[in-house]
Swiss-Prot record:
The lineage of its organism: Bacteria, Pseudomonadati, Pseudomonadota, Gammaproteobacteria, Pseudomonadales. Belongs to the class-I aminoacyl-tRNA synthetase family. IleS type 1 subfamily. It holds the Pfam family tRNA-synt_1. A motif ('KMSKS' region) lies at residues 608-612. It catalyses: tRNA(Ile) + L-isoleucine + ATP = L-isoleucyl-tRNA(Ile) + AMP + diphosphate. Its main location: cytoplasm. It is found in: Cytoplasm. This is Isoleucine--tRNA ligase. It is an enzyme of class 6 (ligase). One of its GO terms (biological process) is isoleucyl-tRNA aminoacylation. A motif ('HIGH' region) lies at residues 58-68. ATP binds at K611.
Length: 943
């Protein structure tokens, strides 16, 4: 048999079948760097509309984890897709550099007794070192950005502009000093932000404590009695015995019914609804003597169990009946509700008792417990209560309790003098900060939508923002307080600008080493220089000011507003939250137009990632084994609005999907062998009907893909691209065109039409995948024929796809019908192959028995129907002529019969045709192949 291989147009490409991503991706990174891709995008972006995704800064501490990878990849997909959509989409990565975790690391390494200036120096060095490590990992993920000039909250310019942002808020009268209970960590020795608090189970003692009545006559009258004939106690229940020494009041709900219970040796005051459960807990018998509403008990005095002072009853709406006794003991220094209730009843700051020091130890002067650590003092307080006859019950419970996110140790509320941003404080002009923020939320688009209600609820219910910290490594609050009056210097805003100018040159050290006389002159002796630092959430929360408006100036002309903030869902109480407050305080609007949140990573069983469970996935390991593009494809394929499942098995499935997409692109490239779009591209009207349909299908898909990118539905992009490769291309079009592509004349219309379609599809496909498979798209781009920009990212969505007019005979609906018929034929061919009735599809001859309308439709393809069905023969017949052994199909009005061909196989096209062997010069070829080799070539019209 003659070898006819040389007469075929076989696929050929240097594009590798094996991806080798771990080895090839670094070469692409070098290419992007060598051509200055990010800088070129900025250069061509001047006339484009701007899209600003402002980076929420990760903390400059430790290696990146899988959550970091998810976040940065999502951001990069958006930036790349916006670039392809014709936007100028700068991406300035940033880092959060100040704060306790870094200071804690330095103290752990170098000891706690370092001079403050040395601590700051080492913190700055440590943060810089951590940033370099994280930066390398983010770049390796393929994230395109201004890596040579990222923003860092510790950059001198950023530190200075943060002070200026604070000055703006001072100018508008949002900032004040106050004594309030704040989240306090003994290990940190500082207040904590709400976002630095996490909850964990804690075992705590619970005690029921009786406070003896001091105003017995008033108590009797409240219950409608003439007098009390025995001692009486009002009973509280608490899980914090250590707060009893600081008790200053008792709270009841005005509308709850309270009972005076005769418990034998004394009367007990309890919520009526809880009498039965309380008596059972006390192992006592008792009888309700009288009842009264809580409001009747207001201002009745009781005595502290072991100190010579009174505890009056105050009314409070937060008292509930879900546990305890229905009466709450109030220590205003150690509880927010307690504090506000006592203040409402006229208690001054000087009257508030605060015996617990910053390290958790009682002051030495506290009777009975001085010098004791509060957690260790709990049993001693219980013993004292038992000694004085006030302990009615003592148990232990496990409950959810607030802990420090860094030290994992329990926190307390502790009233300290701190600097606050007032939520309801009336500014010099306009609405309160709470009102501004709640209004701004209504102007913000949330993705997913439930984020709006979540953030609204947090803002509506949050207390004033405590912005001061008692640490070394942080941006200073550069205030001077008058020693006599405690008031801020009258030139505070002006002085803050002078400090900012110094910080811009020397960093935060400029404030800490500053002699007050340098700024205040002779006034210095009258003022105290404050050394508090700003909450790190103020650092990151003002990046819209000191980055978009300041160091990088990438905001819109209208001001430092980002189009999008994108972070994990925990940032509703973190960066989204603090940015909203600072934006509304300074500019009276949110610093973002859209908020997008993603969930957290879990394993395939829905469990959180944990080293102890052994279910963590390290991004660096995935990159080194599978490649960054596999990680990117996994991120894109997941609905990130909920929990994001990841495991080795899930990543392997992503790798399998990647292979299908890569193989499809390789098929396209290999069949563009010998194609030059400058000379070989056909106009739509000269293309075959099937090829026009394929280009039209790509156009429809591109519209859907562009919309999915606009709406951040990357999982839809993935599924549409993957399905297109598997179904419309792999399962239909590409199989059909192989015969025409390989066997017709190299420069025939039939082949050039096919190549034109493949070229258009490849041009579109490489762009569709570019935001997700960043490395692979760049690799594909280099192998596409024709002149083009250096990088796919310097292009925009492909505009060469042509729509198939609705009025053509073989329109979209026609090919949908043909696809259904082909699927039915394929199913029967599979059955026949399984039964070993036929070998390959080309060994089969199929007869389609169709009702008249369907037969007429299929007849439009003429002799080319067999090429669509990929059988050696395809015959049409009336449905009424179907023999008994014809097979029903899922297509209405269609039956099938497949038989094995009795004809010889063509040695070139492999079709079984009756004219094989009829040509003496080529005894093993069919007439069609002889025409393609020696004649003017076959003519195709449809497929």
């Amino acid at each position: 048999m003659t070898d006819y291989k040389a007469t075929l147009n076989l696929p050929e490409t240097a594009f590798p079948m094996k991806a080798g991503l771990p080895q090839r991706e670094p070469e692409t990174l070098k290419f992007w760097n060598d051509i200055g891709l990010y800088q070129k995008l900025r250069a061509i972006g001047g006339d484009r509309p701007k899209f600003v995704l402002h980076d929420g800064p990760p903390y400059a501490n430790g290696s990146i984890h899988i959550g970091h990878a998810v976040n940065k990849i999502l951001k990069d997909i958006i930036v790349r897709s916006k670039t392809l959509a014709g936007y100028d989409a700068p991406y300035v990565p940033g880092w959060d550099c100040h704060g306790l975790p870094i200071e804690h690391k330095v103290e752990t390494t170098h000891g706690k007794n370092l001079p403050a200036d040395k601590t700051r120096e080492l913190c700055r060095e440590y943060a810089a070192e951590q940033i370099e490590g994280q930066k390398a990992d983010f770049i390796r993920l393929g994230v395109l950005g201004e890596w040579d000039n990222p923003y860092k909250t510790m950059n001198f310019a950023n530190e200075a502009n943060e002070i200026r942002a604070l000055a703006e808020m001072v100018k508008q009268d949002f900032v004040f000093k106050g004594l309030k209970p704040v989240n306090w960590c003994f290990d940190c020795g500082s207040a904590l932000a709400e976002a630095e608090v996490e909850y964990a189970d804690k075992k705590s003692p619970t005690i029921d404590v009786g406070f003896p009545v001091a105003d017995a006559d008033k108590l009797a009258a409240a219950f409608g009695l003439a007098a009390l004939d025995k001692p009486a106690q009002i009973v509280i229940w608490t899980t914090t015995p250590w707060t009893i020494p600081a008790n200053q009041a008792l709270n009841v709900h005005p509308e709850i019914d309270y009972a005076l219970v005769d418990a034998g040796d004394r009367y007990l005051v309890l919520a009526e609804a809880l009498v039965e459960s309380c008596l059972a807990r006390y192992q006592r018998e008792g009888k309700v003597v009288a009842t009264a509403k809580g409001e009747a008990l207001e201002l009745i005095n009781f005595r502290h169990p072991f100190y010579e002072r009174l505890s009056p009853v105050y009314l409070a709406d937060y008292v509930a009946l879900d546990a305890g006794t229905g009466i709450v003991h109030s220590s205003p220094a150690y509880g927010e509700d307690d504090f506000y209730t006592c203040k409402r009843y006229g208690m001054s700051n000087d009257d508030i008792l605060s015996p617990v020091q910053s390290n958790g130890v009682y002051v030495d002067s506290l009777p009975f417990f001085g010098g004791q650590f509060i957690w260790k003092a709990n049993p001693n307080v219980v013993a004292k209560l038992e000694e004085v006859g006030s302990l009615l019950a003592h148990e232990t419970i496990n409950h959810s309790y607030m802990h420090c996110w860094r030290h994992k140790t329990p926190l307390i509320y502790r009233a300290t003098a701190q600097w606050f941003v007032g939520m309801d404080k009336q500014p010099r002009q306009g609405a309160s900060l709470r009102e501004r923020a709640l209004e701004a939320i209504t102007q913000t688009e949330f993705v997913p939508g439930w984020g709006q209600a979540r953030l609204h609820g947090m803002i509506a219910g949050r207390p004033d923002w405590c912005i001061s910290r008692q640490r070394n490594w942080g941006v200073p609050i550069p205030f001077f307080l008058h020693k006599a009056s405690g008031e801020l210097h009258p030139r505070t805003v002006e002085l803050m600008e002078e400090v900012a100018q110094r910080v811009e040159k020397e960093g935060i050290e400029a404030w800490f080493k500053l002699d007050a006389a340098e700024l205040l002159g002779e006034e210095a002796a009258q003022y105290e220089k404050i050394n508090d630092t700003l909450d790190v959430w103020f650092d990151s929360g003002t990046t819209h000011w000191h980055v978009l408006r300041g160091s990088h100036r990438i905001g819109h002309a209208s001001g430092p507003v980002a189009d999008l903030y994108l972070e994990g869902s925990d940032q509703h109480r973190g960066w989204f939250h603090s940015s909203l407050l600072t934006g509304c305080a300074i500019d009276n609007h949110a610093p973002y137009r859209q908020l997008l949140t993603h969930g957290f990573t879990v394993d395939e069983s829905g469990r959180k990632m944990s080293k102890s469970l052994g279910n963590t996935v390290v991004p660096q390991t995935v990159i080194d084994t599978l490649g960054a593009d596999i990680l990117r494809l996994w991120v894109a394929s997941t609905d990130y609005s909920g929990e994001i499942a990841v495991s080795q098995q899930i990543l392997q499935r992503s790798a399998d999907a990647y292979r299908r997409i890569r193989n499809t692109t390789r098929f396209l490239l290999s069949n563009l062998n010998g194609f030059d779009p400058a000379t070989d591209l056909l106009p739509p009207q000269e293309m075959l009907a099937l090829d026009r349909w394929a280009v039209d299908r790509a156009l429809l898909l591109q519209r859907e893909i562009e919309e999915a990118y606009r709406e951040y539905r990357f999982w839809n992009v993935y599924s549409k691209v993957h399905n297109f490769c598997v179904q419309e291309l792999g399962g239909f079009y590409l199989d059909i065109i192989k015969d025409r592509q390989y066997t017709t004349g190299a420069n025939s219309v039939a082949r050039r039409s096919c190549q034109t379609a493949l070229f258009h599809i490849a041009e579109a496909l490489v762009r569709w995948i570019a935001p997700i498979l960043a490395f692979t798209a760049e690799e594909v781009w280099k192998f596409l024929p024709g002149e083009r920009a250096e990088s796919v990212m310097l292009a925009t969505w492909y505009d060469g796809l042509n729509e198939l007019p609705a009025d053509v005979t073989l329109n979209r609906q026609y090919w949908e019908q043909v696809m259904a018929v082909k699927a039915a034929v394929n199913k029967e061919l599979e059955n026949q192959r399984a039964a070993k009735a036929v070998g390959g599809n080309l060994q089969a001859e199929v007869t389609l028995y169709a009702e008249d309308a369907l037969q007429a439709q299929l007849a439009k393809l003429g002799n080319e129907l067999r090429f669509v069905l990929i059988t050696s023969t395809a015959t049409l017949a009336p449905l009424s002529a179907a023999p008994a052994d014809a097979v029903d199909s899922e297509v209405a009005g269609l039956k099938l019969k497949v038989v094995k061909s009795t004809h010889a196989k063509c040695g070139r096209c492999w079709h079984h045709r009756e004219d094989v062997g009829q040509h003496a010069a080529h005894p093993d070829l069919c007439g069609r192949c002889i025409e393609n080799i020696e004649g003017s070539g076959e003519v195709r019209h449809y497929a």
